């Protein structure tokens, strides 16, 4: 009798195994994806707090299918280190400043050319025109642009007051090691900076290896550089850019609904970061003054003719080495000319 029922039992066993396999193996829709995401911004800053809010929103809306693991404070290394880890699959994304963006799609850094913009409105207008090119440039190089942000207008922070280029020539100025934009600016200004990883800046200010750095107010506060400097020169050199990025490979492996979720929430987060960064930089300047830092008025000659010369020389250098093609710079200058012809300008809110 047992032999008579053995084929049935074997069939039942196979069916049960199949059902168990189907139930225990999640479908693509149920699979959990983890986005390991790095940033130089220290924990507790506006930037990291808003990144965590983004991560929480994505986890909630995806019902736990897309999770973030955020690494703040440069624990995964400087931006070139993070990009290398993304290429090797150790990380899947990060928040980058212009330096890192330049290693993804260098033409985007046309938005950081020194002394290019006269107003916030100009920045927003030109960025909007150029954004489709930036997005495609990221894709062509293996990345997906998820959100755009800013770090804000960059100023010199120094241990001694700086009003002129001659003052700068007597200072030990930091330059972000390997940064083509910084090199172009300093070469155009006739300056010889000290190249260092951003991770080494605080220690180098403490030891006296450098005595001058450049940063937006919020960055100088977040990195604690302001504790080692006493003066801020009131000439904003450039508006520092930033972006939220994931590897193209990771993005394409996500189901379409998670791709759309990541893009939608990432764009909103970038917009929120721009608004918060502009606000916090303005408030940060007031806080720094309250803590005893002095705002130094730049010499008028530096603000006018010399500024234009530096900007032109830096742009020419970046065109000649192929970092930013001439066609890109020409297009941006064209957009600026169109905007300025049709809009009344508001001056930058330079601290006094």
Language-model segments: what does each one mean?
Residues 1-8:
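N-terminal secretory signal peptides that target proteins for export/translocation
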Residues 10-13, 140:
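Short beta-strand-initiation
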Residues 12-23:
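Bacterial N-terminal signal peptides
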Residues 22-30:
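Bacterial Sec-dependent signal peptides at the C-terminal "C-region" and cleavage site
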Residues 24, 134, 270-272:
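A short hydrophobic/aromatic micro-motif that marks alpha-helical segments and, especially, helix-coil
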Residues 29-122, 138-352:
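N-terminal secretory/targeting leader peptides
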Residues 124-137:
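Signature of the catalytic double-stranded beta-helix
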